[in-house]
Amino acid sequence: MKEIGALQAEYPLVNKLIATEEVFWINPNIEKYETAIKDSPLNEENVKDAEERLKRFAPYIAKVFPETKGANGIIESPLVKIPSMKEALERKYEQPILGELLLKCDSHLPISGSIKARGGIYEVLKHAEQLALQHGMVTEEDNYSVLDSDTCREFFSKYSIAVGSTGNLGLSIGIMSANLGFNVTVHMSADAKEWKKDLLRSKGVNVIEYEDDYSKAVEEGRRQADADPSCYFVDDENSHDLFLGYAVAASRLQKQLEELEVVVDENHPLFVYLPCGVGGGPGGVAFGLKLLYKDNVHCYFAEPTHSPCMLLGLMTGLHDKISVQDIGIDNVTDADGLAVGRPSGFVGKTMEPFLSGNYTVSDEELYRLLKELADTENIYLEPSALAGMIGPVKVCKEDEYLQKLQLTEKVKKGTHIVWGTGGSMVPNDTMDEYYRKGLELTI
């Protein structure tokens, strides 16, 4: 790896990252969709396959998780307009947001209350299906609700699943695996919130805590799983299945936009702002959206100023060969879901030609935005889920990207979607504390 001095000389923005200042970065390596997709390791067929698998499991999900019954076992979240928040942002930052502002409430996804309910649950279901088909427990033509039986739970109990997590992925995988009957272990990093660990333990999940950060928890989980042939490791850093589980969100979002009569085409661009940790969730969603909307969708990743791992990896082209700690950043943030020091190389390399840019936001700003959203729209998100909220302001303010792609006029007829990644499962007293912090920082 290059010396820090050489990186600073080649990429002046590194200086601001080191100073943990908020930055906005336009990806110089973005390509036209038709060029980018040619070299992509994944394609539309892979996403369709994931979508079909989730449909096969829908009867099982509806039976085991009654809260999904109304949607027939499809795990989906609302897409809502947030006009009062839009006004508040325009006032606060003295910057008009051109176009309409919507919030995708993955914070309110059933089962585990975060975006991780998409990829995490999908990967567990895929593994369960492979085992069940292999051992003649089901055929693809069966109604998968038959998996909710003592016989199947006993069968799955011979196998184990492990994952390393800062919190939300652990919740999704822990809850789903335990329901099916698997023995499940979640390796939690130091920044994981206590309530998330408690909730997992209450579901019979084995939680192992580490003093170290996320990368260490993943490494340890992987090592232990490798030693046990009956253990399946959900690898958040390299998993194609997690990524595809997230990508399915795009076609669901397309239907919701149609219901709201929101047009997305060359004259009506779509901008999407996704909080980013190791990269799987935002990468998968952005990839799915690119498959559908091609060059008419513009995706941005949002990271905490103390954990800008994906921005650092993409900007330097070093991907997972560099961590924020390598340039002296501490990777300590209250945005626990985004507290990742080293990005996924797979996601960074896959998304590099598709991504419009990255930006960072401070913890203090996340708390202020949390309070603002609660006040204006009565929607409560966890701190990390607010990282996307400042995106529309940044894109409209630093309009170099809009000018470059001749979008300065078109953006007025466009739509901005902030991806609210988690929050509905946060205990009330914890949420009150978050709100108080936002209030103190606003006064």
Swiss-Prot record:
Organism name: Bacillus cereus (strain ATCC 14579 / DSM 31 / CCUG 7414 / JCM 2152 / NBRC 15305 / NCIMB 9373 / NCTC 2599 / NRRL B-3711)
Enzyme class, first EC level, given as a word: lyase
InterPro entries associated with the record: D_Ser_am_lyase, Ser/Thr_Dehydratase, Ser/Thr_deHydtase_PyrdxlP-BS, TrpB-like_PALP, TrpB-like_PALP_sf
Cofactor: pyridoxal 5'-phosphate
EC nos: 4.3.1.18
Reaction(s) catalysed (UniProt annotation): D-serine = pyruvate + NH4(+)
An example Gene Ontology biological process: D-serine catabolic process
Similarity section: Belongs to the serine/threonine dehydratase family. DsdA subfamily.
Pfam families xrefs: PALP
Keyword Lyase included in the entry's annotation: yes
Name of the featured protein: Probable D-serine dehydratase
Sites of N6-(pyridoxal phosphate)lysine modification: K116
A GO molecular-function descriptor: hydro-lyase activity
Taxonomic superkingdom: Bacteria
UniProt keyword annotations, A-Z: Lyase, Pyridoxal phosphate
Gene: dsdA
UniProt signal peptide: none
